[in-house]
Structure formats: C-alpha cells, structure tokens
C-alpha cells in the first residue's frame, strides 16, 4: 500500500474559457456567453492585490474597492486608474477580481455642497465615519445614479478578455457592505433611517434596480452580489428583508451572489443549521435559482477560541463553509501571511480543491468529513421530557445532552458562550463546545454522504483527549466503529449524477483514519456493479497513535448505489477491534501524486492561546470592523506588479 506523500503547494488548473460579448458602448457583432463567476475562480481570494501568487499559489482572485470619494473628487471628473490597475492585474496574473463602489460615508464632500444634507450620528465607535449623506435626498439619488452609470460605462469599455476577469460586483447601498445607512442613529430625527424601515428598504431596492439595469439586464452581464436580502450571515435573522428577496429573485437574470460569512469563521456557532438550510439548495447542484456565496475571514481567527489551535480551526472553518456550498473565501492579509508560518495554508488549498465542485456531473472531487454536533434546539432527537425545555438559555439542557455522549469525548468548555449569538461567540468564546444552539448536527459533506450514520457507527470528539495547540486537525471530530454494539460499518453514497452512468470507470479514494490499536483490521469496499461489493484495500493497524491517509485507485468503479444499503462505498470492520475515521474523499480518475496533505505535526506557535475579545469598534452586534492599518493587516506594496 503506497502512502500519500506530503505537499505544501498545488495550483488548481484554470479553465480556459472563450468569452464573446455585446459591448454596452458602441457597436458590436458578438454575443456574451458567461453566466456567473467562472467556477475556476472559486476558492480563496486576496483583499487587494497584495500577495505574490508564487508565494501564495492558492489565491484565485482579489477584491478592488472603488469608493466614490476616490473616483470622483470633483463633480463630473472621474479617475478610474485604481480600477484599471486592478483589472489589468487580474488579467496579467490570470486570476479574477470583484469590484465594489462604496458611497455612504465615502461620498465626496462636493456632493454636500450641491445641497445633500450631511448626517451625523450618536455613534462613538467609528471615528473614520464622521458623517453620512441623507440617502433620500433627490440630489443625492441623482448624483449617485450618475456615478454608478459612469462606472458601468467604463467597465464595459474594457476589452472582452479583461471584462471576463470581473467575477462580480458587490452592491453596496449604504455604510460599507453592512447594508445599513448609518452607524448609530441620526442626531437629527428628520434624517433618521432605521435599517429595517420602509424608507431605507425602498431606497435599497431602487439601488438594486439601478445595478441590475447597468450590469445584469444588458450584455455582457456581470454578476451581482447582494447583502441582507433574506437570511444573512448572522444566522437567518434578517427574514424581514422579504422585499429585497422578492425583488432580486424575480428581476435578476444572472447568477445571484450572497454574503454568507459566519461558517467560514469557525464551527459550532449558533444558527449554523439555519444558514445551511436556507442557502445550500441554491449553492450545490441547484435546481432553479442559482447562487454563489462569498464570505470573509476577518479578524475572527485572532479571537480566543480560534487561537486555541489555529490550524485545527482553519481546517474546520473551511470544511464548514464547503458544506454550505461557499464559493469564495475572502481572506485578510494577516491570515494570508501567517498561513505558511503557522501551518494552516493547507486549509486554503483544501478549500480551493472543493469550492468549485458544484455540479455532480462535472465535479472531479467529493468528500464527507465525519462529524456530529449536539444541537440542543432539536426537540425530536432530544425530547424535552428527558432533557428539559428547548431554549437557548437553558444551559442545563445542553449539559444533559452532552453528558449522554461524554464517553465518546463530548464536552462543553465554555458554558457562557452557549447563550450568545454567533457573532459574539466568535469574538468572546474561550473554549470548544460540542453542543450548541442550532449548530450543524450531521457530517460535513460536498457531494458525498454517509447513510444512516448514527445507526451504523458512533460519533467521537477530541480523539486524543483535551484539545491543545498541538492537537491534530483531525482530532476535533470523527466517527468510529463500536463492535460491542454491532456498529461495524459505515456506508457512503455519491450525489446523484457524480457517477454519470453505470459503466466501469476510474475513481480514487482517500480515507483518513486513526491508527489507535495494534492489529486492528478494516477494509474499504465499493460498488463495482456486481451483486456483492468488491474490496479495494485491506488495512491492518500498527497502533502508532497517529492519523494516516490511505489512497487507492480503482479501475472498475460503477458507483450506482449497488452496495449494501444503496451505498457506493463502505468502511467495514473485519475484527473485534474498533477503528476511527475522519474523512473520506473521492476523486474522479487517478489519485494525485504527490498528494495534498497537511503538515505532519501541529506545532504551537508564538502567541497562541492569546486571542483578544471584542474591543471598541468591534461589538457583538456588528462583529469585526476591519482595521487594515493595524499590525498584521497592513496594506503592503503590491507584489504582483
């Protein structure tokens, strides 16, 4: 059996795409074929073009903000040089870029001189936002419309090959991308605009219509990304935005973009299940409406719970986001630069590998990461009569449920965090919790699913005991055999369409398992189209207490649910000893040689376990405010020039 060898860098192939278009300005005889961001652009993105692709080969794209006060410093005089440079760099480096045109507090001062009211607020945390425009002013609307219209004209003046590098445009209608008019409340009640109020929501819809007219309802289309249109990144609490949801789903003709930030910032935070149930159906093998999702890794990785084991947390954050169907992971400079030194760049390569696996018939890879979350909101699995009233504030209920799984390693390290919202959790939580309110309870998957996991195997947490900065990324969650209870097999099936047909084909399987018992035996069986499953590999453990990767290529895989319980694959216990598994991966074709693997050992680094909680300007309602002028996220000289 050949062990997979380690590799620290692998660049996904970039799809060659021929783009034909009709230009917005002037006469053209072409048609444009692109619909939505290229799948090859899905993966980790840089915030700006700050990092060399040779040093950070996992980068798939970069953002470029074009604030109004930088572009139009004088009325009617436009300086598009910053956007031109960004598009040129994307083209030159064979990557993608997304654009945004921030107004709000980035409105140029001359606009106020034209008669737009200047709004100050009672906010004391955002010194960089001293005032805002009154968005409902007819003068503001006229000038803002002119600015966005001129931006569209300039974008569509680019050559077709450069336009193709613009993956999408983020629609920003208010203050930053938060889709709120102001930070705080207006000091003059005449200009008050509650975020959920009809006036502000109507203004947002007007802006949506403007962007749609300029970028979506003409050729060439450029996809649009919206925030706060239904279930936002705070766990689906913004259903009040029904007006926006109805408008975009009825009027946007291209692929829709959404912000879905929570899941890529950690795992086991409140309301994960709400987010996944809301968006996953639009992101993975969608039928009807099609979406792509972008999220940010802000400063959450420097917070207490994340700093307990940065490598482990980045890995499970990537897994969590991929389970949702997230397309783009926008990573801060500090995290980008620390990734190589601190050993978590593997998570970025892993995310790149799977982010574009959207449609099963064309996907090349699938995974199932074994996991169980104890969702104490679930009254069916955990009846109130046995465990107590189902309320997020009922910590005793969470403790009772966790106690039922304590023999498998389940624990709660920070009880106080259970009652927090997910934004506050990622800022202030100080320990790992295996129970949570509406956390994701099943395995994390992308196109590969386990059949009846709780009936056929056991969940396992903290495989080698209490989690430390040196714990393996795989120690966090796992599943295993329990021979004494008859749980000796795990069955898996691929998403319908992945196999394509019933003909034998070449497929490669990778299984990550923990060698905990000397002499333990298990095997990997698969559906080869016969009446009984065929064995791909037999493994005997050495008991070295380490995680191992077993990779095998099979030449006659049929994978049409012909195995036991309708499975394509099965991990089978072949003795009375129990084995533990972390993840199963399927690849279309031959296995990768060399393969992508994490570092052999997880090492504590200088400053670990010293994450800081929220401070001024970083409250539990808003989450992390980006401070790019702070150490670790400085804007550096462009290295891609």
Show the residue positions of the predicted features.
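Extracellular carbohydrate recognition and processing domains
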Residues: 531-563
